[in-house]
Amino acid sequence: MSQTDGRITMAINQKLTNIIEGRVVKSCREGASEVQIRFQDGSTMMVKVMESNSPPLREGSQVRRVHENGTELMIDSEDGTTLSLQLIEPGNSISVRDKDGAAEYLG
């Protein structure tokens, strides 16, 4: 994490960004320990969380990039909204599966 112009910036998770960039959110549901994001292409992202610090991503928003630093995960969308989450276990809290259930990302 670095600080620029008074704002804290986090490293981009390039692998995850490359997988979900451009996908359009169909729904975003936040539970007590898990956030589920369904995309219009039928894929699903599950994130095990300690807490969510922001409102869910809006239906129809398009993913721009994903930032990660330790337990912090931020998903930016093209409409300017950001989903900010605290991961339960870095490296073992995120899964993305395609419409057939095949793993695209585990980390």
What feature does the model see in each segment?
Residues 2-107:
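Surface-exposed, interaction-prone regions used to assemble/regulate multi-protein complexes
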